[in-house]
A protein has these predicted regions:
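Short aromatic-rich membrane-water interface segments that cap or initiate transmembrane helices
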Residues: 45-47, 140-152, 294
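Juxtamembrane helix-capping/reentrant segments at transmembrane boundaries
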Residues: 34-48, 101-115, 286-288, 292
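Hydrophobic alpha-helical hairpins/lids featuring a short glycine-rich hinge
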Residues: 72, 76-107, 111-113
Length: 321
């Protein structure tokens, strides 16, 4: 059945994207490009966004099929809740930007409050209503040490889900970058899940992986469609949730290393400018810095993919030992 889920997720996305692109163009749901960014990005202006709807719909449909046939499907139900929750936040943000022509979208406060709400509901469903059972301790790799947090673990969940949701969102600035890194990440977590005996989570990772494989041909340079916040916020939230449910939280630092680096580059840039009035990078997130020093977009993307693959393998090794 795993092959069926994979094929279904792949086909649904691959078929939906070319159907959605003309609709998005007709409705003028196009991406706005920052004027201070690399000049090579100006040609991307108007490229349809909100393409994440396609793979999210594929994930929802395929997961609902899987829930029918998979024993102990509660992990899939919970992951589906997180997918829809963070995806809905991203969709509303995209809608305000492209339909209401308000480049700010949701305010930072509105977005954070909504993300925190999803994270708290996830904790309640899992640890209060026991939809799934996972430890409320953070396990230190290569040791038998676990830091017990009990109900304070909800604070960690909020930090982890909100942090990685926004980290993937920051990374989604170059054609195919966030999509391919996510494919690498879900491949690692699929393997890890099956090795650890978490079959339902592994099946969900396979669904994620193949839904994104169906999207990648349309998102790779030159991109015909962008995933938008609809897709990126959901992907980051799912990554964090999977690492939590596997009790392998810290593996995500390596599996999602590029997302972490991109986020740190923004934080360092803002802190440096506020404290000294000077910028560390020509532009943040850091992928734009490399473009502005002369790297082609394709070079930046392929180097970041390579980093993601190597660090992902390290994260997998950490997770299964």
């Amino acid at each position: 059945m795993i092959f069926v889920y994979a094929l279904l997720a792949l086909v649904i996305t691959f078929v939906l994207v070319p159907v959605l692109i003309p609709t998005l163009k007709r409705m003028k749901f196009g991406q706005s490009i920052r004027e201070e960014g690399p000049q090579s990005h100006m040609k991307k202006t108007g490229t349809p966004t909100m393409g994440g709807l396609t793979f999210l719909l594929s994930i929802v449909i395929t997961s609902l099929v899987a829930i029918i046939f998979v024993d102990q499907a509660n992990p899939i139900i919970l992951l589906l809740f997180v997918t829809i929750g963070f995806g809905l936040i991203g969709f509303i943000d995209d809608y305000i930007i492209v339909v209401k022509k308000n480049n700010q979208g949701l305010t930072s406060k509105q977005k954070f409050l909504a993300q925190i709400g999803i994270a708290i509901i996830f904790f309640v469903l899992s640890n209060v209503f026991h939809l799934v059972n996972f430890s409320t301790s953070i396990h230190i790799p290569f040791t038998n040490v676990a830091i017990p947090l009990s109900f304070a673990y909800v604070i960690f969940i909020v930090f982890w889900q909100v942090g990685f949701s926004n980290a993937v969102n920051l990374t989604d600035g170059l054609d195919g970058l966030a999509t391919a890194l996510s494919i690498i990440g879900f491949t690692m977590y699929a393997i890890m899940s099956f090795v650890l005996g978490e079959t339902a989570i592994g099946i969900f990772c396979i669904i994620m992986l193949f839904a994104l494989l169906g999207f990648l041909p349309y998102n790779i340079n030159p991109a015909k469609v962008f995933m938008g916040d609809t897709g990126s916020l959901a992907l980051g939230g799912i990554f964090a949730t999977i690492s939590i449910m596997l009790n392998q939280e810290l593996s995500l630092i390596f599996i999602g290393l590029v997302f972490v680096i991109e986020t740190l580059s923004v934080m360092l840039q803002v802190a440096s400018f506020k404290l000294t009035g000077k910028r560390i990078f020509k532009m943040s997130p850091i992928h734009h810095h490399f473009e502005l020093i002369g790297w082609s977009e394709w070079k930046v993307v392929t180097v970041f993919w390579a980093v993601g693959l190597i660090s992902g393998l390290i994260g997998l090794w950490i997770g299964v030992h």
